[in-house]
Amino acid sequence: MVEDIYDPLDEYINVFRDKFKKVSKETFEELAREAAIDVEANRETCRKVYDNEAVLAEVKNRITWWTVLCVVLWLLVIGGALVILAQHENWPIENLLIAGAVSVLSLVFLLMKVHPRLSDLKRERNNISAILSRLKEEAWSQMAPLNRLYDWDVLTRMMSKTVPRLEFDPYFTTQRLADLRKSYGWDDSFNAERSVVYSHSGLINGNPFVICRTRKMEMGTKTYYGSKTIYWTETVTDGNGNRRTVQRSETLHASVTAPYPEYFERTRLIYGNTAAPDLVFYRKPNGLAGKEGSLRFKWDKYRLHRKARNLKDGDFAMLTNEEFEVAFNTSNRNNNQQYALLFTPLAQQSMMKLLQDEETAFGDDFDFNKAKMINVIMARHMQDLNLDLNPRQYQGFDYDKAQEDFHRINAIYFHAIYFAFAPLLCVPMYQQIRPQSAIYGQDMQQKSSFWEHEALANFWGQDHFKHPDCVTNCILKTEEKQQGDGSTLLTVTAYGYRSVRRLTYISKYGGDGRYHNVPVEWDEYLPVAGNGRILMREDNTQEEANISQKQRLNHIGEILQKSHLDLYRRHIASKV
């Protein structure tokens, strides 16, 4: 029986880090065996590639220095000639002879030595570049069988082998979304103003989760500036009593602040669990774990004590572990009893270890929002990662580098995703409570949800759908229509903005005692919507347990050929 994870930090250090390395190594070795790569031949080709790159860099460096010398000598030739022409009547004959000699010698050296040398070096550069292109083409050809074997699910398969009770869906299904709505109270209003960039759904300990990145537009402001210089004359009296007229000038400045659409992308982990079903709280990082002696810790502790004594503002009661209360700080919670059941002493201990560790984990870097049975983790370390998992990132022409990149990239992904789950794994009750569907099993209706449709549209790119006049990012939304042959037609609407240049005059008081209209140009952003269509078909074939990667890719090829579609991504074939 698989044991639950109650101390995610220790489990990662002692078990999962090395276990994932082993799984990653075995996965790459299996892919390489299937590809039947001649590793030694590729290494020899790559050695020649890198040797020629080094020679090419040296040749380019020499071309640079010879070019500098060429420019200097031409300046001497031209400069000497100009000096002779300008000073032939003023300079003594010996100075003119010296200038002439410098020009002539420079010209001779240019024509006899520098230009031929530059020509030889450029010819050598072109020859090496041609050889390098052929060698790289050969190396890519040697690696082509392996590059073809990478697919969209390679990381999720490795993670499921590494972490017990972690399962990933082939794509975000309508059943998974309906389960989140009906069983856990998920509210689709979250998606109203957002577009899904990518999503990965599944189960951990039988409870549903979604890792998603969304794009949202918020109307902010932008300030534009303009200026106008004014001139006037004044009559002044000097120290001797004489009156005279002087010219004055001043530059007047003005600004206009106008609405400006701003786009933000955020990555979240959404998790459903029926434990503590009425509990609501929100916490954000404060960096106070392990900082008991700091002034801020003492101040926050004092404020929590004061809030606990103030019964008018609610029934907040502090746990006996005050260090945890200050560091995790969920004083906005609505149910002390359910909170205490959820965050047991074991959970508090594991959470404190997680918050303090910045060597293996990421420390206190996450927001934790619990809205009854929906939990949302937004970790800072996830925001800069592209978790679309496009297999092209593994492809390369150098076997050894491809192997290194495969392990490095997937280790980064696993580390980041694992510690996004870690705050949830700290809570024993989240692992002890499982829904009926997870205990008894439930057949899933394999139809893709609108989350997956939006992610597919964003993968194809905004340029396929945006309005011709759109100058901003777009929020892509989709509508589906089932076709008679089992495929689905998606209508994609791209909501963006066009800009119109405006001119506004702002009245400013000048030093001449008058008001002046200062022009300020600014952009007005007006909404536009573009449209496009995607034809798609889900691949619901049940995969055999011991299927090889070649068999998997042959199956994908058959799907694309039969459906006349162009792209296979995450078990969905599609074309624009």
PLM regions: where:
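Generic surface-pattern signal
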Residues: 51-61, 68, 137-140, 144, ...
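Transmembrane alpha-helical hairpins and terminal membrane-anchor modules
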Residues: 58-135
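Acidic, low-complexity intrinsically disordered regions
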Residues: 70, 87-95, 182, 295, ...
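Charged, long alpha-helical assembly modules
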Residues: 444-576
